[in-house]
Amino acid sequence: VYGVTLSDELIKRGNNVIIVSDTLTKERKAKYIKLEFNKRGLSERINQIKTLLKIIKENDIHIVHAHSRASSWSSQIACKIAGIPLITTTHGRQPVHLSRKIFKAFGDLTIPVCENIQTHLINELGVSPKNTVVLRNPINTIEYPFAAQKKDESKKILSIIGRLSGPKGEVAYKLLEILSDMKNLEIRLIGGKDIPEKFQKFFKNKNIKFMGYVNDVPEKIKESDIIVGAGRVAVEGILSGKPVIAIGEAKYIGLITNNNLSDALASNFGDIEFSNSENFNWNLLKNDVESAFTLTKKELFSLRENVEKEFDLNIITDKIEKIYARLYVLKRKYDIPVIMYHRVVNDESEGGVPGTYITAKKFDEHMRYLK
């Protein structure tokens, strides 16, 4: 999702982007080339490197930006041979073992999506702090218009959004155990094609609805009064003006306000701890649900503004483009030509005796050429 969002915006700004990946089902503007990074045998790795070098040469690629461990490994070697920068985005905790410390494969610079990942990379994998910069996963915030919660309905809709398997499934199950007896709530579970057997005990509860996989999550967020989730789900909920209780795979953040937003951002709303540990305080859950209904429209809008500054697609893309340009110049060791204009005049008659001027017409021609 994030790779396509970023590539579409880069293309919109006049860049040429090619996506190389195992699979890609999302619509995109970029050209797509299939390459099975998930195959990690030696012969497959060599083939990946050869293919990447061919793509780099044939398409005059200046920068490679990898978004997974598997693609980073092959890209590290291909970029080294090609003499171009590699940038990686690190979306989660990485395995900590000797081979990873020796061959880090984080490129010339890695972009952890939250502060806890950055701390993990520096402390546990020995990545230099100067080779990391935190940037959130970009979101096109205009797709999530602010809509204050509904106040007039007797039964409120609380939506738990995320998978029902793995660690997120364990969190969802615990949520149902605690909240299933709250009479004023309709609890919706959104996500997951298959419902694990242990959830069947909640089928008879009329206040609990298993929605399964849905295509239009933003629409379901609009219908809700409270959102429970982590990562992108929490961000989308806040942008949409909904109270959000952030609970991820690693941590219970609770009801998000401006007071605990920095803690939420650092952990990607509960999904990532800087150490490999879990930190849940389920005793706060029911109180957080009640408190969510007391948040004012002003408080929710202020929270949205602060989150928008962190995740806005245009802001993030601006920063990434500057990173691309800086690293390319450093890697290729190019000098940057500088043109200095002393004076711009409307007509040559205004030039004066020294004649150190340029006409506005000629200046405009220069700018158009440079662009």
Q: Where on the chain are the PLM-derived regions?
A:
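Nucleotide-activated donor-binding/catalytic signature segment of Leloir-type glycosyltransferases, i.e.
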Residues: 191, 196-214
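Conserved catalytic-core segment of nucleotide-activated headgroup transferases in glycan assembly
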Residues: 152, 157-198
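N-terminal strand-loop element at the rim of the active site
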Residues: 2-44, 192-199
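A short, active-site helix/loop in glycosyltransferases that binds the activated sugar's phosphate group
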Residues: 107-132, 139
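Acidic anion/phosphate-binding donor-loop and adjacent secondary structure
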Residues: 122-123, 130, 136-154, 166-169
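Short His-centered aromatic/hydrophobic patch
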Residues: 66-72, 90
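Terminal accessory/targeting
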Residues: 325, 329-371
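A charged, aromatic-enriched C-terminal amphipathic alpha-helix characteristic of glycosyltransferases
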Residues: 146-149, 274-325
